[in-house]
């Protein structure tokens, strides 16, 4: 979805200010750069600048993208170490009981699991 991170971060920033949160975390990562300009490091730098002038000066909110410089296989490996239940995650752009296996997101996910040397639990249902 074009501009999705602009939308997500804008809502998150508004809510964070209301509830006085100290940080917002977003899971954007390196492989998304090609199709989504709002996944690039330059976008996050610009959004952080905008946030500093767009919210109350007394309330500073950090915007953190800890996966930004990682690829899918690195994220999947990290998730495995952390016990992420990948069978409950969804990457496919289409609705259904099982991922389509054809969209870009499914291809990136399959490649990530393969490069990490792991089996995707969603594809083995």
Task: Please provide the spans of the model-predicted regions.
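Nucleotide-activated chemistry modules centered on ATP-dependent adenylation/adenylyltransferase
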Residues: 1-125
């Amino acid at each position: 979805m074009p501009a999705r991170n602009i939308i997500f971060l804008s809502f998150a920033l508004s809510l964070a200010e209301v509830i006085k949160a100290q940080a917002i975390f977003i899971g954007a990562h390196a492989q998304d750069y090609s199709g989504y300009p709002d996944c690039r490091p330059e976008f996050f730098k610009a959004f952080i600048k905008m946030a500093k002038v767009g919210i109350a000066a007394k309330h500073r909110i950090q915007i953190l993208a800890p996966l930004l410089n990682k690829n899918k296989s690195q994220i999947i490996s990290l998730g495995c170490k952390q016990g992420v239940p990948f069978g409950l995650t969804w990457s496919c752009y289409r609705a259904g009981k099982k991922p389509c296996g054809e969209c870009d997101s499914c291809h990136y996910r399959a490649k990530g699991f393969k490069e990490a040397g792991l089996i995707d639990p969603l594809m083995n249902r």
